UniProtKB/Swiss-Prot annotation:
Membrane-protein topology: Peripheral membrane protein
Subunit structure: NDH-1 is composed of at least 11 different subunits.
Enzymatic reactions: a plastoquinone + NADH + (n+1) H(+)(in) = a plastoquinol + NAD(+) + n H(+)(out); a plastoquinone + NADPH + (n+1) H(+)(in) = a plastoquinol + NADP(+) + n H(+)(out)
Primary enzyme class: translocase
GO molecular function, one term: 4 iron, 4 sulfur cluster binding
Function: NDH-1 shuttles electrons from an unknown electron donor, via FMN and iron-sulfur (Fe-S) centers, to quinones in the respiratory and/or the photosynthetic chain. The immediate electron acceptor for the enzyme in this species is believed to be plastoquinone. Couples the redox reaction to proton translocation, and thus conserves the redox energy in a proton gradient.
Cofactor: [4Fe-4S] cluster
Species for this entry: Prochlorococcus marinus (strain NATL1A)
UniProt-recorded name of the protein: NAD(P)H-quinone oxidoreductase subunit I
Database matches in InterPro entries: 4Fe4S_Fe-S-bd, 4Fe4S_Fe_S_CS, NADH_quinone_OxRdtase_chainI, NDHI
Biased composition, class Basic and acidic residues, residue ranges: 192-201
HAMAP family: NDH1_NuoI
Family annotation (Pfam families): Fer4_7
Localization (cell): Cellular thylakoid membrane
């Protein structure tokens, strides 16, 4: 009889501990259910990158002096600079410039050390292709202006996910109805227009008060 009671007690302890672990796991699950989603419905929703985002490199052929500084500072010597020496002017003449984005690590060293600022990092991050050889961009492809996320009317641009308000370290600390970060340009324009209208209204009201005082003095 005593052995049976000990088995029942052990079984009860194991059941209680299992229920405790189950409640802890479900608690984490329910906590995540109350949080805001951190994903976007790509490609119908796209994030607007930050201003310092290191995307596709933009190249300006007219500014390049073929100094090959970008090649020397590149960790993998990726840029290919094709140039010839002009014997009359004793200067380099650039023929072709290319970067293979299939191997690029987007470190930004070439942009940082370029003496003529002919290279710049853009916000374009959609570089997928069916053929890896098409990722080798020449000076013509590099010279194209980057496409904007907000230019496509069928895509909803989202800017609130990549950023957090000042002083917030964890995105889950924000309430569900609060914006996670920066605002869209249209929202900023509306707020500026509202502020201007309020300033005009305050100025008009301040002008009316002296007029009333003058009328009473008369």
């Amino acid at each position: 009889m005593l052995g049976f009671l000990e088995k029942v007690a052990d079984y009860t302890k194991e059941a209680v501990s299992a229920a405790k672990y189950l409640v802890d796991g479900l608690g984490v699950t329910f906590d995540h259910m109350r949080r805001r989603p951190v994903t976007v419905q790509y490609p119908y929703e796209k994030l607007i990158p930050s201003e310092r985002y290191r995307g596709r490199i933009h190249y300006e052929f007219d500014k390049c002096i073929a100094c090959e500084v970008c090649v020397r500072v590149c960790p993998i010597n990726l840029p290919v600079v094709d140039w010839v020496m002009n014997k009359e002017t004793k200067k380099k003449e650039l023929r072709n410039y290319s970067i293979d984005f299939g191997a690029c690590i987007f470190c930004g060293n070439c942009v940082e050390y370029c003496p003529t600022n002919c290279l710049s990092m853009t916000e374009e991050y959609e570089l997928s292709a069916f053929d890896r050889h098409s990722l080798n961009y020449d000076n013509v492809a590099l010279g194209r202006l980057p496409t904007s996320v907000t230019s496509d009317p069928s895509v909803r641009p989202l800017r609130e996910l990549p950023y957090l308000p000042k002083g917030i370290m964890d995105p889950h600390e924000l309430p569900a109805n609060q914006q996670r970060a920066g605002k869209l340009p249209s929202q900023i324009i509306k707020e500026l227009q509202a502020e201007k209208s309020e300033e005009k209204g305050n100025n008009n009201s301040s002008d009316i008060v002296p007029n009333k005082l003058n009328s009473t003095n008369k």
